[in-house]
């Protein structure tokens, strides 16, 4: 008893020691420091690459649903190309699937389409459906179309991604992105006494939809939406549009808008002014590398090298001609040349308008920069065309040649003008801008390569619109209703891939790994250890580096798996379709034979000569390729390129826990020694 009594502490001292130990334990429990990718449970950084095709599913808690955008596979994102991937169907109810995390989208869409009778084509969004929360550009399209169906589906079987909800149909007036849903198998969580519970995100909810990134809006007007031949117009203002007939980038539309605004090539009447693009103009400029990094523009849309030429004027039979007038023009790209021969030598401060019936010289007027030259004569000039042939900010030269317009319809802006009594053979109007010199313009475009990702000043939802005629001559048809990426996958394999995408060749050459998830989990994880002096900032950097590195490899691996699986499914679909056709023919043949009508082939003719193809070997080869890529040759392990820092830092989580336990034991012994 005496030996046992030596090991016992007084009651008051025991209480103090126990309280001190419990404080340490609770402190460790409350301030857990996750280092690595944290999802449903804390994962070590090195475990991420081994989750694909390496782990088995023990419970549904190990599944994490992720929305992957189709633009990551290289599909065309402009409105004309995107609308060709959507179609209407009836008799198929919509389906909605929730997902936990997604990628930031560079291009989102917002549709409001009406039928010819004025009724709505698209259904309103159900309760709980919110717009996609991370959009760099939102393409807002309005217009009319036949809408031959109840709902707008994706022809390739992809989903329309909303905020944490993916639907098979398009809802009216809600931002959405195209994508597919993938499921990740997470490692089974390890329950320990000192581990804090994982932070749960609110289901289908995003608190901050802006995420400190500017969202720019482009507006369009579409005619005959959903039909084989449609017209899409990019809207500059309510009466000025640009007809788009080729793939383009949002940056091109922004620069085109600024150029038209700067040159004052806007409709000065209540009628429409529709500009078309010359074939020599490159509309695929200024490609972005997703959100974080803006690539230098490989080519600038130089306004001083563009020519604006009015082509024709169409009027309806209505009494109010001004409200029904449609003026068409062409924006062309001209080679750099000298225009000294077009500048009047005796009047260097004038803009020359050459008119076949006469010429009158007017004195120059003082005006502000950026205003138009307005011709207000009442007589009709046969064959007149206004063409801006040069400008560098303050200098502009305009000449007119014949197309059958009245002088009041020319896009110029001089409120008053009087003809000179000296001659009746020529007319020269005074502009509010001096004549362009023969020197090369030095004013850079407004969107310089070094500009930031903020939206341009003219890109608000009110003054940016997008309207376009988009009928592609070489448009590819869909390959079937397959619930996967399909066309995007074909593009990622090289058939339709856009070469200007930045690709991390270290991870893979078949997809774009420059992606980032917009989960609320990351902010909590990164901030969980920032309070520690000296150690906090470094640990946050470790977390971010590990997250970005492993996420890229994981997403690329998923895309490769989807690519090869989809091709096999396409072949299987084709084989099934042909087998069904062959079965129907046999049924018809039996029917005809029973009626003794002379045999199947005699009655069916060429339709009898259908032979179903055997695609078994092709499907088997694709499956073997998947096994070879993801089982025999798994994704690269991060240990292959570990250096001294990435090697010893893996001991940090364990070291922190061991150090805390040692400190607690030492403190307990010290307290016991002092109290004893």
UniProtKB/Swiss-Prot annotation:
The record marks 501-502, 637-638 as: Cleavage. Residues 672-676 are cytoplasmic. Residues 1-32 form the signal peptide. A lipid is attached at residues 670, 672 (S-palmitoyl cysteine). Residues 312-351, 406-458 are annotated as: Disordered. Glycans are attached at residues 40, 204, 208, 238, 257, 268, 296, 314, 366, 463, 563, 618. Residues 305-485 are annotated as: Mucin-like region. The chain crosses the membrane at residues 651-671. InterPro entries: Ebola-like_HR1-HR2 (IPR054584), GPC_FiloV (IPR014625), GPC_filovir-type_extra_dom (IPR002561). Gene3D superfamilies: 1.10.287.210. Residues 554-595, 615-634 form a coiled coil. Residues 33-650 are extracellular. Residues 524-539 are annotated as: Fusion peptide. Residues 330-344 have a biased composition (Basic and acidic residues). Pfam families: Ebola-like_HR1-HR2, Filo_glycop. Residues 54-201 are annotated as: Receptor-binding. Residues 415-430, 448-458 have a biased composition (Polar residues). Disulfide bonds join 53-609, 108-135, 121-147, 511-556, 601-608. The signal peptide region modulates GP's high mannose glycosylation, thereby determining the efficiency of the interactions with DC-SIGN(R). N-glycosylated. One of its GO terms (cellular component) is virion membrane. The record marks 57, 63, 88, 170 as: Involved in receptor recognition and/or post-binding events. Belongs to the filoviruses glycoprotein family. Filoviruses entry requires functional lipid rafts at the host cell surface. Essential for infectivity, as it is the sole viral protein expressed at the virion surface. The mucin-like region seems to be involved in the cytotoxic function. This region is also involved in binding to human CLEC10A. This is Envelope glycoprotein. It comes from Sudan ebolavirus (strain Maleo-79).
């Amino acid at each position: 008893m005496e030996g046992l009594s030596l090991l016992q502490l007084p009651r008051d001292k025991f209480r103090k020691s126990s309280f001190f130990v419990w404080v340490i334990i609770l402190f460790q429990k409350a301030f857990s420091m996750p280092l690595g990718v944290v999802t449903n449970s804390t994962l070590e950084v090195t475990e991420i690459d081994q989750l694909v095709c390496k782990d088995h599913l023990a419970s549904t808690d190990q599944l994490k649903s992720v929305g992957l955008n189709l633009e990551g596979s290289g599909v065309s994102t402009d409105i004309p190309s995107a609308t060709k991937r959507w179609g209407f169907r009836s008799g198929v109810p919509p389906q909605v699937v929730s997902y936990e995390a997604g990628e930031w989208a560079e291009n989102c869409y917002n549709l409001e389409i009406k039928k010819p009778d004025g009724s709505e084509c698209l259904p309103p969004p159900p309760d709980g459906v919110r717009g996609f929360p991370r959009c760099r550009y939102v393409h807002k399209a309005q217009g009319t179309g036949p809408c031959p169906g109840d709902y707008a589906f994706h022809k390739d079987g992809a989903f329309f991604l909303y905020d944490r909800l993916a639907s098979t149909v398009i809802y009216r007036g809600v931002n959405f992105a195209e994508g597919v849903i993938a499921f990740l198998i997470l490692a089974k969580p390890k329950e320990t006494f000192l581990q804090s519970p994982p932070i749960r995100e609110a289901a289908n909810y995003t608190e901050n939809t802006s995420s400190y990134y500017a969202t720019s809006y482009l507006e369009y007007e579409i005619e005959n939406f959903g039909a084989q031949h449609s017209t899409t117009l990019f809207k500059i203002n309510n009466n000025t549009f640009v007809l788009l007939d080729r793939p383009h980038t949002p940056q091109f539309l922004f620069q085109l808008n600024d150029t038209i605004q700067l040159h004052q090539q806007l409709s000065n009447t209540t009628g429409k002014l529709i500009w078309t693009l010359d074939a020599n103009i490159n509309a695929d400029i200024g490609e972005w590398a997703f959100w974080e990094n803006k690539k230098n523009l490989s080519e600038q849309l130089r306004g001083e090298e563009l020519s604006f030429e009015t082509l024709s004027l169409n009027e309806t039979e209505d009494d109010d001609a001004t409200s029904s007038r449609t003026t068409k023009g062409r924006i062309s790209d001209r080679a750099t040349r000298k225009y000294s021969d077009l500048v009047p030598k005796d009047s260097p401060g004038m803009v020359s308008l050459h008119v076949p019936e006469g010429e009158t010289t007017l004195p120059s007027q003082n005006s502000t920069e950026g205003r138009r030259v307005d011709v207000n004569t009442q007589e009709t000039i046969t064959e007149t065309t206004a063409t801006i042939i040069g400008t560098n900010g303050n200098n502009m030269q305009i000449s007119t040649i014949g197309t059958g317009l009245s002088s009041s319809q020319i896009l110029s802006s001089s409120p008053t003008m009087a003809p000179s009594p000296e001659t009746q053979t020529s007319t020269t109007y005074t502009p509010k801008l001096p004549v362009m010199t023969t020197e090369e313009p030095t004013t850079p475009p407004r969107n310089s390569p070094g500009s930031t990702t903020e939206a341009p000043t003219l890109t608000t939802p009110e003054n940016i619109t997008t309207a376009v005629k988009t009928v592609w001559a070489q448009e590819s048809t869909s390959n079937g209703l397959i619930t996967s990426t399909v066309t995007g996958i074909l593009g990622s394999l090289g058939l339709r891939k856009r070469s200007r995408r930045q690709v991390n060749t270290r991870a893979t050459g078949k997809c774009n790994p420059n992606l980032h998830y917009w989960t609320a989990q990351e902010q909590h994880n990164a901030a969980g250890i920032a309070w520690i002096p000296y150690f906090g900032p470094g640990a946050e950097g470790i977390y971010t580096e590990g997250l970005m590195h492993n996420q890229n490899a994981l997403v690329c691996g998923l895309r490769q798996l989807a690519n090869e699986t989809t091709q096999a499914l396409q072949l299987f679909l084709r084989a099934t379709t042909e087998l069904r056709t062959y079965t129907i023919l046999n049924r018809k043949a039996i029917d005809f034979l029973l009626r003794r009508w002379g045999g199947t082939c005699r009655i069916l003719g060429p339709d009898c000569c259908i032979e179903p193809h055997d695609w078994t070997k092709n499907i088997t080869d694709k499956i073997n390729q998947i096994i070879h890529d993801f089982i025999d040759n798994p994704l690269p392990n991060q240990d292959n390129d570990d250096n001294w820092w990435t090697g010893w830092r893996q001991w940090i989580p364990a070291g922190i826990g061991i150090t805390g336990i040692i400190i607690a034991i030492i403190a307990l012994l010290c307290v016991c020694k002092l109290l004893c």
